[in-house]
């Protein structure tokens, strides 16, 4: 919501960025430089051109935080119930002025009869390439808070929750198996791993997590700078994700590990493609 109201809100505090020592406390990336899901959520929220949903009024907007006008855009918003039945879809053509917030639509979720539902947002350029995407899993009823002065005096550092939102239906998501492959992409001065991943099932693949490991030891290779991670794939949806790494481990020992909330864990070989082919 801050992006939508950036000139009205008082600001955003990020706590905390990383751990100065091995710890289980919250972070965007830990002592070992392993990024958590929050890192990729924050990265997405900071896109200069960003499509987002607002929890307070169910609005969808395009936030342009750059100093450039961007024209000939298409914003797509789709509402699914928990069973992935499409309940609403809207496609809007728009232009986004520099430093602006452009309204797309409101999500009519009042008629959803499942306790959890999903909102899928995509922003495309005139060539049909994805500029921004977002996927939300939402409760039918949001958490409620105690904003009273008495509560503030007793607990000045946090706002008490009087009722928590219920997302327990996510535990009932059907298991899925993904098609995944990985290859090394070389270019002058850099070396990347490119992952192709697809959800061939009729079910949602929720919170897909990718990692690169040493096939000999099983240890995760860190740091790896992932383009995106902890994302979700709708039925039939595919994604190409690139990761940059710097490791002395021989290529033959590299493995891609794929897992997630409701995803069968698997390990794939990393093929070598020289000279930046298929980049």
Where in the sequence are the language-model features?
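Carbohydrate-binding surfaces of carbohydrate-active enzymes
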Residues: 1-228, 233-243, 251-256
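Residues that form or immediately flank small-molecule/cofactor binding pockets and catalytic motifs
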Residues: 17, 263-265
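Eukaryote-biased activation of long, low-complexity terminal tails and linkers
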Residues: 265-271
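Mature N-terminal, pre-catalytic/accessory segment of carbohydrate-active enzymes
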Residues: 272-276
